Each structure stands twice: as C-alpha cells, then as structure tokens.
UniProtKB/Swiss-Prot annotation:
Keywords: 2Fe-2S, Cell membrane, Disulfide bond, Electron transport, Iron, Iron-sulfur, Membrane, Metal-binding, Oxidoreductase, Respiratory chain, Transmembrane, Transport. Iron-sulfur subunit of the cytochrome bc1 complex, an essential component of the respiratory electron transport chain required for ATP synthesis. The bc1 complex catalyzes the oxidation of menaquinol and the reduction of cytochrome c in the respiratory chain. The bc1 complex operates through a Q-cycle mechanism that couples electron transfer to generation of the proton gradient that drives ATP synthesis. The gene is qcrA. [2Fe-2S] cluster binds at residues 96, 98, 115, 118. One of its GO terms (cellular component) is plasma membrane. Residues 63-153 form the Rieske domain. Binds 1 [2Fe-2S] cluster per subunit. The keyword Transmembrane applies. This is Cytochrome bc1 complex Rieske iron-sulfur subunit. PROSITE patterns: RIESKE. The keyword Ribosomal protein does not apply. It comes from Streptomyces lividans. Its main location: membrane. The cytochrome bc1 complex is composed of a cytochrome b (QcrB), the Rieske iron-sulfur protein (QcrA) and a diheme cytochrome c (QcrC) subunit.
Length: 170
C-alpha cells in the first residue's frame, strides 16, 4: 500500500554534488586545497555555487553538507574509504543517518564522530560505520580528488541516499 500522491522520483536521492564540483569551506566560503586540511582536523564543506540567499538553500545544504577529515592513510581500515580519499582526506555526509541531525563533534584520537541529538557514533577510520547509538547505517562517503588547480573536488554524487532511512532504502 502506498499514498496515491506523486512519487518523489530521484529528488530525495540526489544532491548538488557532481563530478568536478569544488568543496567549499562553509566558514570561509573558499574552495579547499589539501593543505587546508590538517591531520586530525574537522572541516565542514558544501558544494561550490550554493548561496545562502538561494530559494532552496536549506533543502540543498541539508543533503549536501560534508565533514572533511584528514586521517593518516595507514589508520584507514576500510579499503573503499582509502580509495575514495585523497592523501587521507575523507569526505562524509554531515547528516546523521538516524533522524537527520547535523553531526558536529569529532574525537581526534579515536576518529569517532558523534551526533549530538541521540549520540550515534561513527568510526570515520572504518567507513563511518555505526559503533554506538540508534543510527541504522554508516554515513555516506563522497568520492573526492584534486583538480588541475590543486583544489579538492567531488568525483560524483553520493552513491547512496543521505540522511535517515526513507522509502527507497531497502
């Protein structure tokens, strides 16, 4: 059984990330270079071209916000995570997979990110898998690289929906 209203299509599934889209620091509004991300630091990023005065800003930032963390490459346990990173810099959705709260707490020594709403904890050195709390699955990772000018860029969109579970996730 389902509601007879229109299906959302791919609107819930896709974000503004696409191949070549620059990662922009949310605090400075400047494109990020690998040298801007120190080992053990947490930086928040958004796609280039997303402006606060845009009509759909809140909707788009809720799906596209990233946590950028630089880990020592030998501390990354998940093979895909390492392949999708650049020199140990990983990009994960900032949106908790439990109820969609923004994750903002990071513990350098353990590489754990904590959602302040219900304490779901994710191991960012192991594919952002859930290690504690009510979140049902890992944070989606965005594949990143560096363009010819030396800026961090997306190599596509997330390969799975961002945020909490919804009708399409199975």
């Amino acid at each position: 059984w389902r509601d007879l209203g229109p299906l959302p299509g791919t609107k819930l599934r896709h974000t503004l990330w696409s191949k070549g889209k620059l990662l922009v620091n949310m605090n400075t509004n400047e494109p990020l270079r690998p040298s801007d991300v120190a080992v053990g630091s947490l930086t928040f990023a958004m796609p280039e071209g997303l402006e606060e005065h845009d009509e759909d800003f809140q909707n788009e930032i809720a799906k596209a916000a990233l946590m950028i963390i630089r880990l020592e490459p030998d501390s990354i346990k998940d093979k895909r995570e390492l392949e999708w990173s650049h020199e140990g810099i990983v990009a994960y959705s900032k949106i908790c997979t439990h109820v969609g709260c923004p994750i903002s707490l990071y513990e350098q020594q353990t590489h754990h990110a904590l959602c302040p709403c219900h304490q779901s904890t994710f191991d960012l050195a192991d594919g952002a898998r859930v290690i504690f709390g009510p979140a049902g699955h890992a944070l989606p990772q965005l594949r990143i690289g560096v363009n010819d000018e030396g800026y961090l860029e997306a190599l596509g969109d997330f390969e799975e929906p961002v945020g909490p579970a919804y009708w399409e996730r199975g």
